[in-house]
């Protein structure tokens, strides 16, 4: 008999809810991006916390109109960005508050996890169902706040193998997009415009082993615009530089951890241009659908099911 779990994630980008059926199906998933004023690169934490506080009751009401929330057997929530000591962002307090209230009112277990583990769980589930929850995998998590190459052991233990020494890939993409007049986050619009460029581009990336530097990418893109290159060209160049970085870091990881599956997740990895470039060079790498790749609560709901003993017993 199926059981159902609720996942809640309140990142600095979006408010997300999801319901997971322990038969192995995502019943529903909802996401609302936080409003960012034109020309700005994100929100202050106090503003993000406010918007989550407003959005959560509305979104839970919407969810309740589509699914009987009295059937929920456990609730999961991301309480901080990463499963490491000192990791903290106030925006996650909104989700924790809502999850605690829901669990207490229903008398059901509350499972605390992290935003990064939620991303990992959603991506691994989308790539190969429960199989990747039983083994070690390499996960590339690239978003506005991460450019991390991770070693995942059943998502219970996550080790960072490599990262950016400065700017994150999502930050570089967003800064290029906002400079071109797009709203924040700008990844979707940057990818759309990049697809209009038919020119062959040779990207430049700065990678040493499993570590990278992306601060130069923003400067390169600004220089290209100043030199008269079209916005479409610059957007494509930016995305291909990220893709080339992924390829080089992945190859370095595969030398050290041969035989492990590689899964790509995070909002930046939703780009068709990045996916195409990477898979032409590393065809065995898994990319997952957008709703499992960008910010979501799907992974949190899945982890709630596992940790509550309702799934993968």
Label each PLM-derived region with a short phrase:
Residues 1-2, 108, 112-137, 302-303:
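Conserved phosphate-binding catalytic cores of ATP/NTP-utilizing and phosphoryl-transfer enzymes
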Residues 3, 10-11, 18, 27-29, ...:
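A short helix-loop
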Residues 11-50, 157-160:
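Short glycine-rich, Thr/Ser-proximal phosphate-binding strand/loop in the N-terminal lobe
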Residues 30-32, 51-66, 245-250:
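Short, well-ordered amphipathic alpha-helical segments that serve as non-catalytic structural scaffolds
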Residues 61-97:
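Short beta-strand-loop/turn "lid" adjacent to the catalytic site in phosphate-handling enzymes
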Residues 77-80, 143-145, 263-271:
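Glycine-rich beta-strand-to-loop/alpha-helix junction loops that act as flexible
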């Amino acid at each position: 008999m199926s059981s159902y779990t609720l996942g809640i994630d309140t990142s600095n980008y979006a408010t997300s809810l999801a319901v997971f059926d322990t038969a192995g199906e995502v019943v529903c998933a909802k996401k609302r991006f936080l409003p960012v004023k034109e020309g700005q690169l994100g929100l202050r934490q106090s503003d993000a916390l406010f918007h989550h506080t407003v959005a959560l009751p509305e979104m839970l009401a919407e969810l309740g109109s589509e699914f009987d929330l009295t059937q929920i057997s456990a609730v999961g929530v991301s309480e901080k960005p990463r499963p490491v000591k000192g990791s903290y962002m106030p925006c996650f307090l909104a989700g924790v508050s809502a999850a605690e209230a829901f669990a207490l009112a229903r008398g059901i277990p509350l499972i605390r996890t992290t935003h990064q583990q939620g991303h990992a769980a959603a991506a691994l589930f989308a790539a190969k169902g429960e199989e990747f929850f039983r083994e070690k995998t390499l996960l590339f998590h690239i978003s506005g706040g991460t450019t991390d190459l991770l070693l995942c052991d059943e998502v219970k233990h996550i080790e960072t193998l490599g990262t950016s020494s400065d700017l994150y890939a999502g930050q570089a993409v967003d800064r290029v997009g906002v400079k071109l007049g797009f709203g924040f986050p700008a990844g979707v619009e940057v990818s759309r415009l990049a697809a209009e460029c038919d020119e062959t581009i040779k990207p430049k990336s700065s990678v040493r082993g499993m570590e990278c530097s992306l601060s130069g990418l923003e400067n390169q893109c600004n220089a290209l615009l100043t030199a008269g290159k079209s916005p479409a060209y610059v957007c494509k160049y930016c995305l291909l530089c990220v893709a080339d970085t992924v390829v080089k870091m992945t190859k370095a990881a595969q030398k050290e951890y041969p035989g492990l599956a590689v899964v790509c997740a995070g909002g930046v990895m939703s780009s068709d241009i990045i996916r195409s470039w990477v898979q032409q060079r590393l065809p065995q790498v898994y990319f997952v659908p957008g709703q499992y790749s960008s910010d979501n609560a799907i992974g949190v709901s899945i982890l709630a099911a596992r940790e509550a003993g309702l799934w993968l017993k």
